[in-house]
Amino acid sequence: MGLTDGVFLIVCGAQFTLGILXNGFIGLVNGRSWFKTKRMSLSDFIIATLALSRIILLCIILTDSFLIVFSVKEHDSGIIMQLIDVFWTFTNHLSIWFATCLGVLYCLKIASFSHPTFLWLKWRVSRVMVWMLLGALLLSCGSTASLINEFKLYSVLRGIEATRNVTEHFRKKRNEYYLIHVLGTLWYLPPLVVSLASYFLLIFSLGRHTRQMLQNSTSSRDPSTEAHKRAIRIILSFFFLFLLYFLAFLIASFGNFLPETKMAKMIGEVMTMFYPAGHSFIVILGNSKLKQTFVEMLRCESGHLKPGSKGPIFS
């Protein structure tokens, strides 16, 4: 193992640790709240499932990183790599859709519009979110099924290519494989569009609300304005981190076609880990309950609480 491999594993390990700590913290706080009250709000449920999916995703990415360093042959071919790709694809799409559902929930709860369609969705927000979560599960299964079909076509192509019988049938299968491979990236489009729609609706709603506050000579730092800003920050950060993640995913996926194959894959893996690890802290800071518990925990760790006293996280 060379210096580059060592640095790569250290960076991946650090990102993995931060991601597990943050997402684990989210799961712990929401799980503790549910254990005490036997109830969980819709937003807490979505955040908890988002954290769980990201913990699994981080474990998959870390496993993939170890394969790049210690077992390149297994990483580039074989059933193990296909299994990792299948679990990565399913968990990845599920995580993205959970983040999208969270943005839609914030939009429906915080934004204010008089359009009948928006009001219909707002009044039935719980039912809408349940159907969105079910749709997210189905679309994640669909993207995984598309990947499995891609693997089957790839196996057929390898078999035909091995016989060195490049016929019209081979060309058709190859074109079909390339088409499915390109269309596979379109599974990312729906959550991206929905997130953008939620973001712009919140922006328009905040603009209207701010103008009303100015007309009424009211402070612009009222609770509604702050709620708008928090939701916008969470959705916007998800959008930019998602674009970074998608770019990294393409680099990691198409690394075989780049000059420095292994280095390209390493860069892609490091960038890929940044999204599930980094966005968890933005979610924590954007949620009042999680932020309060996190601050109390930091105070306790820093020794700001008196010895023997208990903060909210321990009560």
From Swiss-Prot:
Keyword Flavoprotein attached: no
Positions glycosylated per UniProt:
165
Q: Which domain of life is it from?
A: Eukaryota
Q: Which GO terms describe its molecular function?
A: bitter taste receptor activity; G protein-coupled receptor activity
PROSITE patterns of this UniProt entry? G_PROTEIN_RECEP_F1_2 (PS50262)
Q: Which residues lie on this side of the membrane: Extracellular?
A: 1-5, 63-93, 149-185, 255-265
Q: Which residues lie on this side of the membrane: Cytoplasmic?
A: 27-41, 115-127, 207-233, 287-315
Please name one Pfam family that this protein belongs to: TAS2R
The UniProt keyword set, sorted, is:
G-protein coupled receptor, Glycoprotein, Membrane, Receptor, Sensory transduction, Taste, Transducer, Transmembrane, Transmembrane helix
Any one GO CC term of this protein is:
plasma membrane
Keyword Phosphoprotein among UniProt keywords: no
List the transmembrane segments: 6-26, 42-62, 94-114, 128-148, 186-206, 234-254, 266-286
The UniProt entry, under InterPro entries, shows:
GPCR_Rhodpsn_7TM, TAS2R
**Membrane topology per record:** Multi-pass membrane protein
Q: Where is the signal peptide?
A: none
Localization per record: Membrane
Recite the other comments. Several bitter taste receptors are expressed in a single taste receptor cell.
As for family, the record states: Belongs to the G-protein coupled receptor T2R family.
Q: Spell out the PANTHER family in the cross-references.
A: TASTE RECEPTOR TYPE 2 (PTHR11394), TASTE RECEPTOR TYPE 2 MEMBER 3 (PTHR11394:SF49)
User: What is the recorded function of this protein according to its Swiss-Prot or TrEMBL entry?
Assistant: Gustducin-coupled receptor implicated in the perception of bitter compounds in the oral cavity and the gastrointestinal tract. Signals through PLCB2 and the calcium-regulated cation channel TRPM5.
UniProt name for this protein: Taste receptor type 2 member 3
